């Protein structure tokens, strides 16, 4: 159930990234922002789905659009949507007795929603929209239909852990883009993280790096914020610890989560970046920005490894990722 949750969340984030990237590359937003596509493709490179290139160049963006289709639909592309949906179906079949009929059926119906490899961009966008709607429906069924036993808790732990990792991957794009001489599209990051309207209501201002960090890292009332995921992880691990017959079984995990929470709450987002004053300037990202994200990422990975050793002793401590760049953040 833990890995079912992780792969479900991983596939949802990839589908959202692909949807916004294809939309921006083919139609463009209502208010054009030149760095939208470059930002999204850079994040896909950071997460290992694409090679590192100059994604500001229009010809490279056009070439990469074909690569995005492969990530979405090709059965030969490792760690693309086809691969993830195939794994979800296999896991759902193995866990059939722990899932409701409707939940199991939604898991099995994700794979047929993928478009043909030679589909045009409009068909691809329509299919990605349908996939994300089904994933949202699946999340709703899991939330409303599953009893709060250990199966649900491990599924929830897997999802919250993976969402936390994906949030850090998105935010790493800000630092990466600044290092490469252009500003990351903050509107695009908010849209990909499903927080665009939340930001508008909360701040009623043009997106800035400090405020985006405040919303996506420090806001414990935002279900898409990192600290929200960590608090949910702690809540579920605390229940498992109380119900465990082995004293101290989850004590290490709780210590790691407490350290992450303290680190986030002690963060002063206003000192992590200096907003550009003109459109031609690049945002100045302080070294503490990457130090914070890398430190949080290492702590989440430490939590994952510790939980694996505590509960899945048959599993080796392995880290798999997409083919390009070995899935490493650079």
Each language-model region and where it sits:
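Alpha-helical transmembrane segments and their helix-helix packing motifs
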Residues: 1-330
